[in-house]
């Protein structure tokens, strides 16, 4: 039967006992009193009990202690408080500090004695009194036994305590991986018998060669053993290539500079001098009439509604300002570009004179007001025009031509209605790069449906003269053409770029370099930039076709191109020979595509599609 204490607390009494196998204190329940049948065995002497059990069995020692505990008896409720005061206190487990101290002393005695007998003495009843004394001292500091019983020591805590012991001894605790893979590691670490390597084949004796030359440090060692003549030849080739590149670049810069310097040096003689004292006044008048014819025929658009935006590539001194003022469709903006700075200054002065001589609105009495003019010094063929401020404001398309966006080049475009270049594009055929840059500027400035008009030398006439005459030079007292080198025997210029000749024109052009413009090559290039040929005729054909026009015929008389009474041209035979060298530029029907020997200059017109 359970005692009253058990009924009151709900727990059985227990006692703290030291377990050397686990190296800790454990709580053991107090064994209740046995019936009379078992009393004989309980009343056995301690000597007999100690002889029957092993020395290391701590359970026997603790059991012998429990035998001396008083037997539980039934107590009346009135006597219960008094009985509880007389009952001895239940021993509680010592604190962790006391445990550690007691454990160290006990284990130290055990190892000092070197035998299990010393440890048995520590576990004897004589030592239990010391144990109970420690328990009594620390009973007030420890929690009740029933709470200690509820928190068993986990496996992880036991491992941590074991690792702490190993660390105190200076040993590293084993990791979980080493414990898990102990057998595998040992198996891998076991030496394995290796098969002997096959013997190496005997080396053949090296043939006797000359002793290797010692290399001195420096560039000679890095170059290797090369013949000095080879090194000298390579150096000469490199120097020759550098000289050719430098000469080519200087020539390219030199041509542009020569042309710029020449036109900057041409004096401004005035309109009266050109009409009365000039030796080539008839030729000048004829060339101006052909340019006016191009402007009158091809500058207006189909709608003929809004005012035109015009850009002139190679405007010179502004000689065409008056022609654009008389255009059939009024001009709103004229932009003049030229590489010669002095020519741009003179063009500004001419434009300022036009404004001051035509009233406050800048136009003649009864005529249209003078357009707004902008002038800039710019290489129109070797540089991109997109960095010119006024061109940016009007609009320029950078995606035209090969390599650009197809949609942008097809549907995009610039803001100008007309691009004009009179007696200038032959300077762009110095190289293919310049020719393409010129066409990129033209196509980029033009809007869809815009016109590109101009005048250039007729390559068909030049080819015919080169094929007929062995000496590539011809002219008279008015003009002269001379090729500095050999010319093609068949008259076909291949490649189509860089065929330079020097051209001289009395009172107009000094001995400056120009370049042949092979017409078919030029036309093929224009197609890559969405320019379609509409008109092309030599100068003399333009005269024969337009001299009887109701507007252009009287204009030729006013400009002094033909006599009012006879109707004949006022040019001398030498001037007519000079004018047959060029043809006005304008792309048109197939009949006018081939020059028939009637003009050294020809005119053209392209449409932007």
From Swiss-Prot:
It holds the Pfam family mRNA_G-N7_MeTrfase. The keyword RNA-binding applies. Residues 193-205 have a biased composition (Pro residues). One of its GO terms (cellular component) is nucleus. Its main location: nucleus. MRNA binds at residues 287-288. The record marks 317, 323, 350, 426, 514, 601 as: mRNA cap binding. Its EC number is 2.1.1.56. Belongs to the class I-like SAM-binding methyltransferase superfamily. mRNA cap 0 methyltransferase family. This is mRNA cap guanine-N(7) methyltransferase. The lineage of its organism: Eukaryota, Fungi, Dikarya, Ascomycota, Pezizomycotina. The gene is abd1.
